[in-house]
Amino acid sequence: PAPLSVTTPGISRKVITVGCSDDHMEVLVGKNRMVDYSGRGPTMAAVCKPDLVAPGCSVASCASLRDKYTIKSGTSMSTPIVSGAIALLLEKYPDMTNRDVKLRLMETCRDMGLPKNQQGWGLLDVERLLR
């Protein structure tokens, strides 16, 4: 995708915008993989987005049929992974503010060596996040 391809609500400074990594439709950069369909920053206001990336490749998820599962890929799979990690963080540190959470994510993501408009702070590292 082209720069400036992150859309609302992801362009907000207050939103944690999650990109997708590790998919079969990927671009190899060194040893790191970034999907070639995940939106790229910056925003029109020159805000670096996405904030971070998380795995979103071939994730088992609920299907619309009763008692069924399906395999999906994309930021719709990456974002719940980050949300779950944040829930674990807030369980461990319940007094954290939204700013604290964003700062902690920023400090603990693993740099993939990609441009910031593709990876933001880097790849979610749950183990480091919860230390």
Question: For each of these PLM feature ranges, what is it?
Answer:
Residues E91-R131:
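C-terminal subdomain of the subtilisin-like protease fold in secreted/lumenal serine endopeptidases
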